[in-house]
Amino acid sequence: MIAIAYTLSFCFLGAQMIRWLMPQKSPLVRVWLGVSLGVLMEMGLPALCANALDFTVAAHIAAVAAALLLAAVCYAAREKAPLCAMRETDRRQLAVMAAVGIPLTALSAYLQYTHNIMPAADGSLWCGQATYGDLCMHLSFVTSLKNMRFPPSYSLLAGTSLAYPYLTDALSTTFYMFGMPLNLSLVVPGTLLMALTYAGYMLLAQQLLGGRHKAVTVAALLFFLNGGLGFLYDFDLAFTDNFARIREIFTGYYRTPANQPDLNLRFSNVIADLMIPQRALLGGWAMGIPALYLLISSAREKSYRQTALLALWASALPLVHTHTFLALGLFSGGYLLGNLVEHRQDRRGILIRAGLYLGAVSYTHLRAHETRSNL
């Protein structure tokens, strides 16, 4: 219960900060960005404070104080514009997000529960095929980060710095420290991050596609329910073998419609093979999509507030998921060149905002590297 209340407090602060900084965004975008910002602060601020207080309850209390300070800064820098109300296009977008996102989130909650040390009636513990390998590593991070001195080290190799983007696992450690069972410490934040990913993908698609809500729906379904045409091999002549190949989908080891090594078919489903087992990637997508949204929005609206928020957001990504940070960097470079070509009359403003963005991210990481070297 304490873990849930702690998370809700960060989400509330994040929603307020986005409300002050971007009041003219639609309510859907404000809520999604606000909750995402709250989760990002819950990931990063305790770890930041742990450099002085270790990853303890004291560091988590200090993280709340730091979040309140950031909220005060956002209030001081707030945009004094009327709050955007729900419009008809927002209601249609909400209907699309509910139709796609709610079933996917329910499926995700079930998969998170069944794939991450699910207790059985006889006392045994079970996991999924997809999580069988990764889960051991993530559990070691989640349990060992509790009360650990920072910067963190590998629990199985004393004295060796943890060279892994650990903030998603640190989020689970926070839940674990505040009394949540170990399996639910993976399930609850994992489900939350998956829900944010679904919502973020559809809002990003809306940003790019405009009011084409059917296209947003198709894009989301094609992305999250991918897998190729391997199912044809399972359902071809299914009646002749008493559905043996169909039963093997549920009982065979890594024999799925999307992944059939014997036939050299190796498609990976986004949900089953990436988001469920690869927790760093899950955190990276949940936090990387808002950064991408802010990048596009700040350029279109020529907003220095959004540029500053983007810079701080991007600065946290390497410890969430390094590949997401690299992808954001590549997209940022290409988007900068495209804007310079397309908006020649605003080249100076574009370069100033890009310089602030790049400078803030670079300075943050140079300072972090210098601090780490001195420890």
Report the location of each language-model feature.
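Membrane-interfacial entry segments at the cytosolic side of transmembrane helices
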Residues: 54-62, 86-96, 212-215, 344-357
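Membrane-interface alpha helices of multi-pass inner-membrane proteins
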Residues: 272-275, 306-321
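Transmembrane alpha-helical segments of multipass membrane enzymes and assembly factors
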Residues: 12-29, 51, 80, 200-217, ...
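Perimembrane helix-loop-helix junctions
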Residues: 295, 300-303, 327-359
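Conserved small/polar residues in nucleotide/adenosyl-binding loops
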Residues: 364-371
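Membrane-embedded, hydrophobic transmembrane alpha-helices
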Residues: 1-94
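Active-site lumenal/periplasmic loops and adjacent helix-entry segments of GT-C-fold
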Residues: 104-287, 322-326
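Membrane-interface transmembrane helices that cradle and orient dolichyl/undecaprenyl
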Residues: 283-284, 288-305
